[in-house]
């Protein structure tokens, strides 16, 4: 399916149109989407991605459709992993809930532009350098190793992100205010026009998007060398990311084994790329520059492995004791924060509802085994937050 210029143009117009409609209908007017809205919008974008896959079957055949769906599933799984980092960034900078949609839409648009650039660079490398698959495979194996290490997960903490080079440079050279002004990027403070912290958040999100492209793009080229399919799969997986954030932000902490599943997927694709590179080897110091007989892994087999790994990872996360512990702590943290954020004029019924939910989460934590309750680096902060919420409750009574 060597897509023609017309097909490329129509696809780009479709994607741009979907982003514009999403902005006009759901982002331009500042609001927090309800669960029902998030479900409907997420289902809509997934449905569009599936319809595109059906179109690939009709016009390109089943083999190309399998390649597309394998790329789409892989990039969607990696995008869910991106949401962990987005959540950390948004939480660490204290972005108001009403402004989060604009941050996410910017991140998606920026990611689409940068990843498109990476896609064409990757395609050029594959076309002109015989050893490109060795490079891509090595990158994926390194990324898989980083995801599999517990320390790789710890690098996502808020302070690490805030200390990143991009944020430190922006904070130093850009005049920013200390407070947010709704979802505006600029405000006036002391008769001076300044940028709000929302711009720093967007810079942080954009910077992390660039880093994530280093594992997602090689992974997709490990499944297909069709540039058009790689672009389409990337675009459709990113388009639904904003809705997915609001749909599963309460479940992200529960997916405790997702990174390990992604490590397996990236490692598998990395090995697949290495095998393909050996099969077409032309490097003089490897087997005298001659191809090496290897096992061929089909795209259908790759798609099967991806689906099985994601199913096992998700099931293990939701049914494990560690997953239940993470969920209980996340709920307690969320309700404690929600209670502390209540306005002093909030109705008593609403206060009681949130505090009752907080007490239920605390009771669930108390029923957990000690080894799951005592998590280094999280326990002290959570206990402090809970104490503040109880103190606020006592002060209001």
Swiss-Prot record:
It is found in: Cell membrane. Its main location: membrane. It is a multi-pass membrane protein. Signal peptide: none annotated. Keywords: Cell membrane, Membrane, Transmembrane, Transmembrane helix. InterPro entries: Integral_membrane_TerC (IPR005496), Integral_membrane_TerC_rswitch (IPR022369). This is Uncharacterized membrane protein MT2795. It comes from Mycobacterium tuberculosis (strain CDC 1551 / Oshkosh).
